[in-house]
């Protein structure tokens, strides 16, 4: 049985999700909705500065484009309620615009001739289940209509924090994500559409402090850590490839080797482990949602009290997209 997917919003995440779905048997994209001209969408699908050229053929046709011989309809509806997903057999919508990230807004895809399920590619709030695959995807029972795939940083932080908490117990902690610049920053100094004075500065020429909800949102993924973590972001001049540092106090004293052993034991398809001295360009395109770096683990002890730092890499584009697609595929399999 083939699960048919619709993508609303064909930006960075929408296009990369489309790429990954091409390699998954039993899942296919049959419709894309985006306000941009199909010629532009096709061009941006074919050519990608950070992720490389699309491995396949893309041809613009009337009403959409043809990818590897398969026609995908492209529409340009502003209101999700006006997208006739059912005509193209769409069962699950990947909501990737950023504008319909709350449950009530995302549910518009389910109205009229809509789809059956929605996966939001952003934090969705307290009234939807927030899923980080291979960390808490077992909270899904298939009856849900709208779920959230959290954020790219939460997908990096969550598996590392869970492994640390399961093994040693986290008391409290602060995280910092050293994050690639994104499309919501200016290329050159100029007014920021959201009024942010720092994101108004040239993204490729500055380290730009920014907020992140990833640490606080961890409670939606790992309830035992609710209220125990906080954090911030520093946007840096790289186009993709980010890293998260987590500094915590634990319930018990530990060694660097014990921490690394626990992380290695917890590794899986979503949570990688490396002892190589890598840099940010080395993780561009990786499919791990989080890649733990054992070379950066630190334990500081003063008067018997310890402070622990752990570090994990992520491609804030592809790592996150890979996790979203894993979640979507699983959600489709258990759907009721």
Curated annotation (Swiss-Prot):
<feature type="binding site">
    <location>
        <position position="316"/>
    </location>
    <ligand>
        <name>NAD(+)</name>
    </ligand>
</feature>
<dbReference type="InterPro" id="IPR020830">
    <property type="entry name" value="GlycerAld_3-P_DH_AS"/>
</dbReference>
<feature type="binding site">
    <location>
        <position position="121"/>
    </location>
    <ligand>
        <name>NAD(+)</name>
    </ligand>
</feature>
<comment type="function">
    <text>Catalyzes the oxidative phosphorylation of glyceraldehyde 3-phosphate (G3P) to 1,3-bisphosphoglycerate (BPG) using the cofactor NAD. The first reaction step involves the formation of a hemiacetal intermediate between G3P and a cysteine residue, and this hemiacetal intermediate is then oxidized to a thioester, with concomitant reduction of NAD to NADH. The reduced NADH is then exchanged with the second NAD, and the thioester is attacked by a nucleophilic inorganic phosphate to produce BPG.</text>
</comment>
<feature type="binding site">
    <location>
        <position position="199"/>
    </location>
    <ligand>
        <name>D-glyceraldehyde 3-phosphate</name>
    </ligand>
</feature>
<keyword id="KW-0324">Glycolysis</keyword>
<feature type="binding site">
    <location>
        <position position="182"/>
    </location>
    <ligand>
        <name>D-glyceraldehyde 3-phosphate</name>
    </ligand>
</feature>
<dbReference type="GO" id="GO:0050661">
    <property type="term" value="F:NADP binding"/>
</dbReference>
<dbReference type="InterPro" id="IPR020829">
    <property type="entry name" value="GlycerAld_3-P_DH_cat"/>
</dbReference>
<dbReference type="InterPro" id="IPR020831">
    <property type="entry name" value="GlycerAld/Erythrose_P_DH"/>
</dbReference>
<feature type="site" description="Activates thiol group during catalysis">
    <location>
        <position position="179"/>
    </location>
</feature>
<feature type="binding site">
    <location>
        <begin position="212"/>
        <end position="213"/>
    </location>
    <ligand>
        <name>D-glyceraldehyde 3-phosphate</name>
    </ligand>
</feature>
<dbReference type="InterPro" id="IPR006424">
    <property type="entry name" value="Glyceraldehyde-3-P_DH_1"/>
</dbReference>
<keyword id="KW-0520">NAD</keyword>
<keyword id="KW-0963">Cytoplasm</keyword>
<feature type="active site" description="Nucleophile">
    <location>
        <position position="152"/>
    </location>
</feature>
<dbReference type="GO" id="GO:0006006">
    <property type="term" value="P:glucose metabolic process"/>
</dbReference>
<feature type="binding site">
    <location>
        <position position="78"/>
    </location>
    <ligand>
        <name>NAD(+)</name>
    </ligand>
</feature>
<comment type="subunit">
    <text>Homotetramer.</text>
</comment>
<dbReference type="GO" id="GO:0004365">
    <property type="term" value="F:glyceraldehyde-3-phosphate dehydrogenase (NAD+) (phosphorylating) activity"/>
</dbReference>
<feature type="binding site">
    <location>
        <position position="34"/>
    </location>
    <ligand>
        <name>NAD(+)</name>
    </ligand>
</feature>
<dbReference type="GO" id="GO:0051287">
    <property type="term" value="F:NAD binding"/>
</dbReference>
<dbReference type="GO" id="GO:0006096">
    <property type="term" value="P:glycolytic process"/>
</dbReference>
<comment type="similarity">
    <text>Belongs to the glyceraldehyde-3-phosphate dehydrogenase family.</text>
</comment>
<dbReference type="GO" id="GO:0005737">
    <property type="term" value="C:cytoplasm"/>
</dbReference>
<comment type="pathway">
    <text>Carbohydrate degradation; glycolysis; pyruvate from D-glyceraldehyde 3-phosphate: step 1/5.</text>
</comment>
<keyword id="KW-0547">Nucleotide-binding</keyword>
<feature type="binding site">
    <location>
        <begin position="151"/>
        <end position="153"/>
    </location>
    <ligand>
        <name>D-glyceraldehyde 3-phosphate</name>
    </ligand>
</feature>
<keyword id="KW-0560">Oxidoreductase</keyword>
<dbReference type="Pfam" id="PF00044">
    <property type="entry name" value="Gp_dh_N"/>
</dbReference>
<feature type="binding site">
    <location>
        <position position="235"/>
    </location>
    <ligand>
        <name>D-glyceraldehyde 3-phosphate</name>
    </ligand>
</feature>
<feature type="binding site">
    <location>
        <begin position="12"/>
        <end position="13"/>
    </location>
    <ligand>
        <name>NAD(+)</name>
    </ligand>
</feature>
<dbReference type="InterPro" id="IPR036291">
    <property type="entry name" value="NAD(P)-bd_dom_sf"/>
</dbReference>
<protein>
    <recommendedName>
        <fullName>Glyceraldehyde-3-phosphate dehydrogenase</fullName>
        <ecNumber>1.2.1.12</ecNumber>
    </recommendedName>
</protein>
<dbReference type="Pfam" id="PF02800">
    <property type="entry name" value="Gp_dh_C"/>
</dbReference>
<dbReference type="InterPro" id="IPR020828">
    <property type="entry name" value="GlycerAld_3-P_DH_NAD(P)-bd"/>
</dbReference>
């Amino acid at each position: 049985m083939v699960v048919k997917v619709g993508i609303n919003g064909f930006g960075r995440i929408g296009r990369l999700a489309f790429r990954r779905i091409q390699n998954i048997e039993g899942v296919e994209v049959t419709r894309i909705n985006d306000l941009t001209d199909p010629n532009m969408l096709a061009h941006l699908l074919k050519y990608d500065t950070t992720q490389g050229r699309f491995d396949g053929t893309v041809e613009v046709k009337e009403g959409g484009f043809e990818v590897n011989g398969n026609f995908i309809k492209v529409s340009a509806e502003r209101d999700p309620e006006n997208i006739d997903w059912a005509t193209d057999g769409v069962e699950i919508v990947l909501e990737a615009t950023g504008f319909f990230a709350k449950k009530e807004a995302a549910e518009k895809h389910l109205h009229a001739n809509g789809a059956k399920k929605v996966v939001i590619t952003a934090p969705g709030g307290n009234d939807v289940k927030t899923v980080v695959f291979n960390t808490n995807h077992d909270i899904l029972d298939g009856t849900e209509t709208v779920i959230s795939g959290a954020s790219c940083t939460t997908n990096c932080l969550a598996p590392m924090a869970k492994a640390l908490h399961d093994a040693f117990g986290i008391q409290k902690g602060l995280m910092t994500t050293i994050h690639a610049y994104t499309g919501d920053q200016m290329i050159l100094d100029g007014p920021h559409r959201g009024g942010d004075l720092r994101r108004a500065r040239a993204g490729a020429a500055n380290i730009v402090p920014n907020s992140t909800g990833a640490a606080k949102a961890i409670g939606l993924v790992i309830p035992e850590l609710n209220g125990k973590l906080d954090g911030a972001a520093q946007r840096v001049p790289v186009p993709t490839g980010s890293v998260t540092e987590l500094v915590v106090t634990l319930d018990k004293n530990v060694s660097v080797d014990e921490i690394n052993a626990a992380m290695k034991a917890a590794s899986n398809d979503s949570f990688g482990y490396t002892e190589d001295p890598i840099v940010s360009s080395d993780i561009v395109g990786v499919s791990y949602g989080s890649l733990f770096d054992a070379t950066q683990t630190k334990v500081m002890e003063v008067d018997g009290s310890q402070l622990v730092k752990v570090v994990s890499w992520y491609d804030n584009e592809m790592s996150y997209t890979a996790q979203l697609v894993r979640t979507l595929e699983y959600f489709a399999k258990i759907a009721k």
